[in-house]
């Protein structure tokens, strides 16, 4: 297994992996499968290009993408971990940890000492995983954009000095 930041040539793998994630766990993400499927190929090509504002990471088993995560800089300057997903058969095999580590390192490399994410506390497995990765819950809640009836809570990771 290896993990790397995407490049423009990875757009088809990024698109396929993201759409698979949105079908597999539709209530875990702020975007819907329908909205992501409507993106033009040019949009996916642009998304695959890594920048300090947005970097997607793909995990691969040989040449097959098996997981995804991204670092996105929000308009308020917060650095976010988003789009975290691993194919079912690869869960529990350190793929998710590798993806989180890649996003953390990307954030640090871009000058951030703090990384945030949103998770539904009812998603016990995900919340426990993020806590093991050093994230802590903050008293901040909001509705999930794709499913407004679901409330997500912000979690935060801070780089140790």
Stretch-by-stretch model annotation:
Residues 1-4, 8:
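Long alpha-helical, hydrophobic tracts
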Residues 8-9, 15-89, 100-102, 106, ...:
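Acetyl-CoA-dependent GNAT
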Residues 94:
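Conserved G/P- and acidic residue-centered "switch" motifs that form tight phosphate/ATP-binding loops
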Residues 113-116, 120-127, 132-161:
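C-terminal "cap" of GNAT-fold acetyltransferases
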